[in-house]
Structure formats: structure tokens, C-alpha cells
UniProtKB/Swiss-Prot annotation:
Homotetramer; dimer of dimers. Pyruvate binds at T44, V202. GO terms for biological process: diaminopimelate biosynthetic process; lysine biosynthetic process via diaminopimelate. The keyword tRNA-binding does not apply. It is an enzyme of class 4 (lyase). Belongs to the DapA family. Coiled coil: none annotated. The active site is at Y132, K160. InterPro entries: Aldolase_TIM, DapA, DapA-like, Schiff_base-form_aldolases_AS, Schiff_base-form_aldolases_CS. One of its GO terms (molecular function) is 4-hydroxy-tetrahydrodipicolinate synthase activity. GO terms for cellular component: cytosol. PROSITE patterns: DHDPS_1, DHDPS_2. This is 4-hydroxy-tetrahydrodipicolinate synthase. It comes from Leptospira biflexa serovar Patoc (strain Patoc 1 / ATCC 23582 / Paris).
Amino acid sequence: MFQGVYTAVITPFRQGKIDYDSYFKILENQIRSGVAGVVPCGTTGESPTLSYEEHKELIQKTVQVVSGKIQVIAGTGSNSTKEAIELTESACADGVDGILSVNPYYNKPTQEGMFQHFTAIANVSSKPVMLYNIPGRTNVNLLPETVSRLAAHPKIAAIKEATGDLGQMAKVISQCPTNFDLLSGDDNLTLPVLSIGGKGVVSVVSNLFPRACVDMVSLYLRGDLEASKKIYYKLLPVFVNAFIETNPIPIKAAMSWFGYCSNELRLPMTSLSEGTASESFKKIVFQLKEEGIV
């Protein structure tokens, strides 16, 4: 159901408001580049800083622009189950193809609490649900045993795994049904995750280099590992440098360097710090662009 590259798309801002002109151009580039789908209102999209109205509008406009050409997996997670349900119902009504639901953050629920949270969301969703496990941001880890229980729900179809723990991911794959999809939540682990049975990646770097990310994953899935590895190692410095500061600070800076949007973020996120690390990142991405990587 979920396979390939899904771009965790940034949310451009201009003078404090969502810059839809830039956003639509980014979406069109994603469509042209052949990604499987886009994921608006996720971590990379600065969803915690969006108002409820902005969140709903951004998803609506994404569906309208994409118009069935690629999938839209809408981020509707919250640390309030009630709010997550409301956002999920709204996104489903707008015609998304799937839901991305993150671990409840700050509350620190137990495994049973997360099981009940995600079950409640899945019960109201008319679209497939992709769980999102990112303990580095949420301070709770959705364990393989809990994922296995959740995978029995007919609407829970996949997980975006961002623990960075291949052993844990292997347990998830081995304990869940074969039609339950695991996607990497870390660009730099894309090929390792594919090698243990993952189906793709929810990517940050594909905002900037969508075609290269698509080619890397497509070649691997077609069995051309060597060609896939060549692209992977070309992109690896970008995968690493895209996290020299908290995501999405570096990737939004890089998108502004390439002219896609302004480098405006919403507090408490701030622009990429000037210095050696940012200059190195800038040099890397422009060198790849000069080499024809897109």
C-alpha cells in the first residue's frame, strides 16, 4: 500500500503567513519528480506551530493541487486524542489518501495508552493510518509488541519508523503481517531499512533532491543495488548535514538557497546558524546541483 519515497514537505512562510505560492511550486516539483506521495503537516512541516485552521486549510489545498497525481498522507497527530480524531476526520473528508499519526508527545503515555490512542484514531479514519514512531521528539517509544497489536486493526496499514534502531525495526517487520508496511523515517537509513524488508522512506531530503531520492529507492526495489548505492553515497552528506540543527531548520535553509521559498520559520524554530557547518552544507548541496543531481 505504501511504497517508495514520500516527501515530508516543508511549510513555507512569508511575513508570518503560509506562503501558498511557494508551497504550490514545491508540490508541482514533487509531482514532476515522481515521488509516491507528500506528507503535509508533519515534523518537517512545522505542524506544532500551525493553528487548527491553518492545519486544515493546508491539507485541503494540498489535496486540491495534487489532484490524485500522487498520494497525500496528512499529518493529523496530536498529544490530545480528541484533537487527533478531529483532525483525522477533517482530513479524510477532504480526500487524503492516508493519515500519519505521531506518538502522543509530552504526556508520556504507557504502551497501553498509545495502543488506545491509535486505536481510537483508526476507528474514525476512513483512510489507511500510518503510525509515526519518533521517540527523539516525543519521548515515548512505540514498541514492536504494541505495533503488532495495532497492526491487527484493519485501518492501521504502516509505520514511519524514526527510532534509528534497525534491530527494533526488524522486530516490527517480523512480528507484523506481511501487508503491514514499514518506512524509514531517517534518510540516512533508507537503504539499510530496505535491506531488512522496509518499503521506502518518508524523506526530508527529497524536498531538495526528489528525483535522486526516487531513483535511489526505485533502483533498489528493482534489484539494482549497485546503482542505488551510488546515489545513496552521493546523497549521504546531505542526509547527514540536513540534521546539523533541528529539523526542519537546515532543509528550509537549503530550500531557500535553491530559490524555492524564504528561510522563514516560526518560533520557537529559528534560522540556521551562520558558521562553518552551514557553509559546508551549502557547498555540498550546490556541488550536487552542479553535478545534475535534482
